[in-house]
A protein has these predicted regions:
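N-terminal beta1-alpha1 ligand-phosphate binding loop
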Residues: 5-29
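Periplasmic-binding protein-like
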Residues: 9-10, 75-82, 177-186
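Short hydrophobic segments within beta-strands
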Residues: 10-12, 39, 119, 184
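N-terminal beta-loop-helix "entrance" segment that forms/cooperates
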Residues: 38-63, 153-158
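Short, well-structured alpha-helical segments in soluble
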Residues: 55-74, 164-177
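Short, acidic/small-residue loops that bind anionic groups at enzyme active sites
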Residues: 91-113, 195-214
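Active-site rim beta-loop-alpha module in soluble metabolic enzymes
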Residues: 122-186, 191
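C-terminal functional extensions of proteins
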Residues: 208, 212-213, 221-245
């Protein structure tokens, strides 16, 4: 008998187009018995590209998750659909199920091959991703971050331009001692097969890595038996207030 498992993908960007792109790209990876619901946050930036938009996205993610739980309390895992994982630590602290994001999952897969590079859109992401890798324990494995000036939203909107500039970036990121390259970003989902023939190192699609790692279950175990927040969070959605301990 097929075991039914329920997962949730939250896009912390407010772009429904990006949510659709993510779902269309990762849905073929879902085995029988797996249901993946998708939600898009209603507050924040259309596409996260700086510290401020990342911070707002973390709060919006928690509200979206709490709203979902108020209707669907049984949940087996949550995937944060942004290569930057806003709200990862807060959601992991609060959730009774496993949680990961596109960045953490990609780091996990890439590090199995050894040192890795990242290619992504938006120059402000470089220090943010370096900090995230350090906080997750992948600081030594991350050898290089190559950014392109275009944001993930711009790369998503112009596939021909995206493939050209991302190919050049991946070639630049293929440094000695690097064993794989993460193509990071929700808006970059699906570009890896188009770029791979022109790059000598294996490319890791962050969206694919996200769903693979989430389904495999090799993530930190929840510290809670029931979802909830350690502190009462005032002036937020009623669903958030209902989860306060």
């Amino acid at each position: 008998m097929t075991v039914h498992r329920q997962f949730l993908l939250i896009n912390p960007n407010t772009s429904e187009d990006t949510t659709h792109r993510l779902y269309q790209h990762i849905s073929p990876w879902l085995p029988p018995g797996i249901e993946l619901d998708v939600r898009t946050v209603q507050k924040g930036a259309r596409y996260i590209s700086c510290e401020a938009s990342h911070a707002v996205a973390a709060c919006a993610l928690l509200e979206t998750w709490a709203d979902y739980l108020s209707v669907h309390p049984a949940l087996d895992g949550v995937l944060i659909g942004c290569f930057g994982d806003p709200g990862l630590f807060a959601l992991r602290e609060s959730s009774a199920c496993q949680v990961t994001g596109l960045a953490e999952a990609s780091f996990m897969e890439a590090s199995q091959r050894g040192p890795f590079s990242i290619v992504t859109g938006g120059v402000r992401w470089k220090p943010m991703l370096r900090r995230l890798a350090l906080s997750l324990g992948f600081g030594d494995a991350l050898r290089h971050i190559e950014t392109v000036t275009q944001t993930g939203a711009e790369l998503q909107a112009d596939p021909d331009m995206a493939v050209q500039c991302l190919t050049r970036a991946c070639q630049a990121a293929a440094l000695p001692g690097v064993n794989s390259i993460i193509l990071g970003g929700a808006g970059l989902a699906g570009y890896a097969p188009l770029i791979q023939p022109h790059v000598s190192l294996p490319l890791i699609d962050s969206a694919e890595a996200g769903i693979r790692v989430l389904l495999a279950g090799g993530l930190p175990q929840p510290s809670r038996s029931a979802s909830g927040f350690e502190a009462r969070l005032n002036h937020l959605n009623p669903s958030v207030l209902s989860l306060a301990d």
